[in-house]
Regions:
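Beta-rich carbohydrate-recognition and catalytic domains
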Residues: 216-347, 353-454, 464-470, 474-537
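Carbohydrate-binding surface patches
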Residues: 132-169, 204-208
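Aromatic- and carboxylate-enriched substrate-binding clefts and catalytic-loop regions
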Residues: 1-78
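Generic beta-strand/beta-sheet core signal
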Residues: 2-4, 152, 176
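Solvent-exposed beta-strand/loop surfaces of large extracellular or lumenal domains
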Residues: 175-194
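C-terminal beta-strand-rich structural cap/linker in extracellular carbohydrate-active enzymes
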Residues: 188-216
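Glycine-rich, aromatic-lined ligand/substrate-binding cores of catalytic
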Residues: 66-143
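Histidine/acidic-residue-rich catalytic or RNA/ligand-binding cores of hydrolases
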Residues: 8-20, 111-112, 429, 480-484
Length: 537
């Protein structure tokens, strides 16, 4: 074995020592056809022998058929493309690397390129599923909350395997496998409730099962609108079957009182997020702007308004539920979580989104230090959703250094992230920034999105179920009584004004003057359960 060694505890010298080959390295596939002929066999040894004692330096995942720079000569690869995709999950490297070539960007199957764009390079958990040295190997790895199951066949015969995957029981999966012509194909399947799955592996072929981390829109049949009101600083739910007419589930009364969950005895800006595993998360601003009037504190603000500004606060309220009825809640104080944030002026309008690259939930929000201008920041929440794992980092700042940007809302469409936010540039209103990355690189667009002559804030974008239409809604606080406005788009360039609640096609049947909220998709069953629960309450 090239660079052969035995474990000597060198890992204790990290970061000066990262790893070593100590394996039949992948360049041998280029040097000699014999190694290409035996690639599948050797790949089914690595998990049992080399990776059993640690990471290896191995540049796997060849997508060239001919292993030279031009893909037109030299040795010939015997394994299938999906076999190669599986090795991106199967092999354990200290710093993950792949043997892709520049020409692969134009000649490799698109399904393979899309897989390689999203496959994680670090793993949080590994489980051995099945295998036999030199014959086949099936390994499951978890990144964040998403599982990948990789399988390779080291033989020249068809293998039929009976797998047990309890962590994926009943879930929808993306299934990468070889078709009859040994070409890569991507299918969608739903695993049985018992987690059992029969897998067929073609000779020197492979397969990858990927937990679907994206909500299946076809299963959705209703909409849930979360909002708050200034007079109560509490949380409200409204439901719609068609995305046009919304009815409050508790007849205009709070479902959770702000004084029961927040340090400042009130919440604002509730944002609800539905994770693909069915868990619901809500993030809210821990702030009551009328606490003095309500007799909840002796001063207008929690701290000196001259020093820390209007509406100063220091944290959020985070809530989590499996059924939209029973919720856990936690207060998260940024100043108590990270050193150096004692002078934080505000932490407003938190929203949640899943970062596919990081494999975890990102929270992004408005923040300022002292009474300086407001800017947009992001961090990552922990797995229990009761705290922050990473220190806030800058997400976006308005190009005019004298102006504030607040209330971000991020929507991914295709391979782009569209961030709508409020620009305090003249009359406050909604603008858009676009990036290829979720947490950086947003390009400023100067056009105003909303048609409102009066001040508005709190943009939230949501998709109409079964249609290529998106609705951006916003809180028009500059009118009296305040109301929500709506605009619709198909291209994120042109926006059609739908008017306000009860002044156009959008209706609020049993509530008025909602403030800063969000809309998500829910199933018809979930909508009916909410209606029934609160009717009986």
């Amino acid at each position: 074995f090239h660079g052969c060694t035995v474990p000597r505890g060198w890992e204790r010298m990290y970061p000066n020592y990262v790893g070593s080959e100590a394996v039949l390295a992948s360049e041998n596939l280029i040097f000699n056809q014999h190694f290409c002929d035996e690639e599948a066999f050797n790949a089914c040894l690595h998990p049992f022998i080399r990776n059993a004692v640690g990471c290896m330096e191995f540049g796997g995942t060849f997508l060239n058929k001919r292993l030279n720079r031009g893909n037109n000569g030299g040795t010939t690869r015997r394994t299938t493309d999906v076999f190669q995709l599986a090795t991106a999950v199967l092999f354990q490297n200290p710093i993950q690397n792949y043997a892709l070539a520049p020409n692969n960007l134009t000649d490799a199957p698109q399904v393979c390129l899309d897989f390689m764009k999203q496959v994680p390079t670090t793993w949080d958990e590994t489980r051995f599923i099945d295998g036999y040295p030199g014959k086949y190997a099936v390994v499951a790895r978890r990144h964040g909350k998403q599982w990948y199951v990789a399988a390779v066949n080291g033989t020249k015969e068809v293998l039929k395997l009976k797998l047990e995957l309890p962590m994926l029981a009943g879930q929808t999966l993306s299934f990468y496998n070889d078709d009859k012509e040994l070409q890569p194909q991507l299918q969608t399947l739903k695993l049985k409730a018992d987690g059992k799955f029969q897998l067929t592996l073609h000779p020197q072929g492979g397969a990858v099962l990927v937990q679907d981390w994206k909500t299946n829109e076809k299963e959705m049949g209703a909409y849930l609108f979360t909002y708050f009101k200034d007079d109560t600083h509490s949380l409200y739910f409204a439901v719609s079957d068609d995305g046009y007419t919304f009815t409050d589930v508790n007849n205009g009364q709070p479902i959770i009182a702000g004084d029961t969950i927040a340090e400042q005895k009130g919440i604002r800006d509730p944002h609800i997020y539905r994770a693909p595993d069915g868990t619901f998360y809500i993030a809210m601003t821990d702030l009551h702007i009328f606490a003095q009037q309500k007799g909840l504190r002796n001063t207008e603000w929690e701290r000196d308004g001259a020093k820390y500004g209007w509406g100063n606060n220091r944290g959020f309220v985070l809530m989590k539920s499996k059924d939209l009825v029973n919720w856990t809640h936690h207060v998260v104080r940024i100043d108590k979580t990270f050193p150096g944030y004692d002078e934080i002026g505000c932490a407003w309008a938190p929203e949640l989104v899943y970062d596919e690259h990081a494999g975890r939930i990102m929270i992004y929000f408005t923040m300022r230090m002292g009474n300086a201008r407001n800017m947009l920041y992001y961090a990552y929440v922990n797995e229990d959703f009761d705290g922050l794992e990473t220190e806030p980092r800058l997400l976006f700042q308005y190009p005019d250094a004298t102006k504030s940007a607040i209330d971000a809302d991020i929507t991914k469409v295709g391979d782009k992230y569209h961030m709508f936010y409020v620009a305090h540039d003249g009359t406050p209103g909604i603008k858009q920034a676009v990036s290829k990355y979720i947490n950086r690189g947003y390009t400023y667009l100067p056009e105003w999105v909303d048609p409102e002559p009066k001040a508005c804030e709190a943009p939230n974008m949501w998709k109409r179920i079964g249609e290529d239409k998106w609705v951006v809604m916003y809180d028009i606080y500059g009118i009296n009584p305040h109301n929500f406005g709506f605009s619709e788009t198909t291209d994120f360039v042109n926006f059609k004004d739908l008017g306000h609640f009860n002044e156009g096609v959008m209706k609020a049947t049993n509530f008025s003057s909602p403030k800063h909220g969000a809309v998500i998709h829910i199933t018809k069953k979930e909508a009916e359960k909410l209606r029934k629960y609160w009717k009986n309450k």
